A protein has these predicted regions:
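Short acidic low-complexity segments
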Residues: 3-5, 111-120
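Asp-based phosphoryl-transfer active-site loop
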Residues: 9-24
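Short, acidic loop-to-helix structural element flanking the phosphoryl-transfer center
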Residues: 23-46, 54-58, 72-89, 101, ...
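Short, charged N-terminal beta->alpha structural module
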Residues: 88-110
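Single conserved hydrophobic/aromatic residue that forms the stacking wall/gate
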Residues: 162-171
Length: 171
């Protein structure tokens, strides 16, 4: 028999986002009540995501569009973790970054310089559009000595799948 967990005794919670809080643009069942309970009980909480593409502000707005009020300080992304790692391990370093606003803003905010000629690191994050030119540039920079860092080690990202029938219905 398993042991039951008394959540009231817990001081705080760390939750993944995609697939736990929402899927696509839909809040999952029970999430609104859970967040309300966290606030009512003054519980500490942090939402983690390994998606480096979003800033905490964008995540705040995404959840707001779904009807949830979660302040920006309750989000921590892989972009923020990557930027903190570089700031601590290689102060003053420069990077060639491939990714969205979440990654670029986190790197800038950490005082990391962008460099597309001879960077110390090539940092690859979540992106909606990678070009062959950008990937070739990144590959060449790594071959010339830049260290490669992935802001997310997933081999694939979560996505909504549509069958051909569902696609026909949306047309």
């Amino acid at each position: 028999m398993g042991t039951s967990i008394n959540f009231n005794e817990k001081k705080g919670f760390i939750c993944d986002m995609d697939g736990v809080i929402y899927h696509g643009n839909r809040i999952l069942p029970g999430v609104a009540e859970f967040i309300q309970w966290l606030h009512e009980e003054n519980k500490e909480y942090l939402f983690l995501t390994n998606n480096s593409g979003y800033t905490p502000r964008e995540l705040n707005q995404k959840l707001a569009r779904m009807g949830l009020d979660v302040p920006e300080e309750h989000f921590y992304t892989s972009a923020l973790a990557t930027a903190a790692f570089l700031r601590e391990q290689a102060p003053g370093c420069s990077v060639f970054a491939i990714g969205e606003a979440g990654l670029l803003n986190a790197l800038y905010d950490a005082g990391i310089t962008m460099n597309d000629v001879n960077p110390d690191y090539v940092v690859v994050g979540e992106g909606r559009s990678y070009s062959l030119d950008t990937l070739t540039k990144a590959t060449n920079l790594v071959m010339q000595g830049a260290k490669l860092i992935g802001a997310n080690s997933d081999v694939s990202g979560p996505c909504l799948l549509y069958t051909s029938d569902a696609a026909d219905e949306r047309s």
